[in-house]
Amino acid sequence: DGAPFWEGEDLKGRRLLLFSEQGFGDTLQFVRYAPLLQARGAEVILHCQQALVRLLATAPGISAAIPRNDPPPPHDLRAALLELPRLMETSLDSIPFADGYLPRPAVVAPPADRRLRVGIVWAGSPSHKNDSRRSCKLTEMFCLFDIPGVDLFSLQFGKAAGALGSAEQVLVRNAVSGCTDFLDTAKVVCNLDLVITVDTSVAHLAGALGIRVWVMLPHAPDWRWMLERNDSPWYRTMRLYRQANPAEGWEPVIQQIRHDLSGLADSHNAAVR
């Protein structure tokens, strides 16, 4: 690609190609800048992973989303998504659209008098360099399975989804078996009250949609989650649950989640009675 990199110059009347270099979560997190670039006069083209194309083709500020395995259309300038916080001079106090920025797909609303609907993800991609620290086992989440007033739904993809055997499926329904891309997954997530997940792309998807999400973080988390805080300036609907001591594993984190989930279920079920 011979187009020059954008370095903050005037964008009026220019076609800007945003390209993703990293994982799904990074693309979802930083596509939030597209409306700001459009407001500066750019036509914004997104070159991203195939699984995100249908979801992000309708994202605010995006004129077109192109699979990154396909050649991009002609463009005047280009920028990596992960460079946008720097290029837009973002500070912790100026992170845009923390309330959510992706349009929610149309879904059939569940009954108003239902139990609390909670999606869970226990493992990320095994190819991720930090996967052994950021993922847990489904068995470690078993203490969440018997909370009164809660219906659990698996949002787990990949090999780890095989842990959901016939016995577990009595208590946890597989909600993503028919999903082919992130738009399908977004439709599932938008039918939930809460997502509980390790540090995966589903955490970013829920936050970008403005859905309540609780994220389990290892003792040494990825840079974006910072340290010593239980909220995220990137997503206002997100709560962070951190490992205090890696030697203790995930049990203290999940026990805290069980306590908080029990309280949330009590409040929810009292409200819908």
Predicted regions and their residues:
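Catalytic machinery of carbohydrate-active enzymes
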Residues: 1-273
